[in-house]
Amino acid sequence: MKNYLKPILLIYILAQCLTSMGINASPEPIKYQQPNNMQLTILLKGDEFVHWATTLDGYTVLNNKDGYYVYAVLDSNGDLTFSDIIASDQSKRSSKEVNFVNKLQKNLTFSKKQIIEFKNSVLKRDAQAKSTNMGGFPTMGTNNMLMILGNFNNTTTTYSQADFNNYMNMQGFNNGKGSFKDFYLEVSYGKLIVNTTVTIWVTVPHPKEYYGPSSKWSEFVYDAVVAANTQAGVDFSQFDNNADGLVDGIAVIHQGGGQEATANPNDIWSHSWNLSYAGYSTTQRTFDGVVVDAYTTQPELYGSGSTMSTIGVMCHEFGHNLGAPDFYDTDYSTSGQYAGTGNWDLMSNGSWNGTNGDRPAHPNPW
């Protein structure tokens, strides 16, 4: 394998590095449109930090700098890297491609060395970030939360403010499956009531593609917060429930689908983080006398279609806002799968229960 591919792969991995906590990849097959307009069906693995995919017959693929999913191979050091062969569904492979994949090992993953190098980079950032930790959402009582609907300056939204108000607050939402509020009322045994104020759709200053790289995700959130202040007239002081000078948590919906279910590198991967970790000063984050810091961000749509996002991802990310960690395969040692609490746990695979996450599992007792 050509040596020039190694630094590109390092950039690929580190581009995903945040000290955030996010959702694991959707377990459902994803239909991804390659830049040549051919459709490839893949299974996405991993999380917002490091992710890869496999074809339905088990060959590992990576998304290269041109937006193509190509077959992954091992270099002379045993590290996972890109080939120059564009991946296709099994039934659409040319004879050249068939000959190539017949020589490949299935279900390749990043080497231990790659993962250690990656984790060391993340842990260093994490230690720096957590020194500025500014708190989270109350775990009991009746509390207010803000949801900001953020549209890019080159996209059109599908669902309305009223739709998301129902999604967050309506008793028996989605034919009795329940809203976000219903979910947390149930799993807290009536001890946590979250009343969410949903803004109008506000428009951020850049196109969707600008915010695609992980280094821009927090910028999207900050731009949405500023837009909520100027375009929607939000009074942020209403969302400091314990009067400590901090907004306890903000949920930001972005137009379109999330990368965890689209496999598209131009989409934001749902996650929970803090604007202070991204370098925004207290002055920049102060609105109406309170400071904005902790946030979650989730998609408007499930995958690349037109179906509204389900509550599973939102409930998982809010779990981080309450202080819960991830319980899926966060060290990538089992190819993105973790039997553990699995489908029984909101903070593991249980956020995807039901149809694409419309009936998420309760969180574990952590």
Per-range role (PLM):
Residues 249-251, 255-366:
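Extracellular hydrolytic enzyme modules, especially secreted metalloproteases
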Residues 4, 21-291:
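Zymogen propeptides/activation segments of proteases
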Residues 12, 137-138, 242, 308-312, ...:
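Short, charged/polar micro-motifs that form catalytic or ligand-binding hotspots
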Residues 1-8:
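Bacterial N-terminal signal peptides that target proteins for export
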Residues 7, 47, 234, 328-332, ...:
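Generic macromolecular interface patches on structured domains
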Residues 8-17:
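Bacterial N-terminal signal peptides
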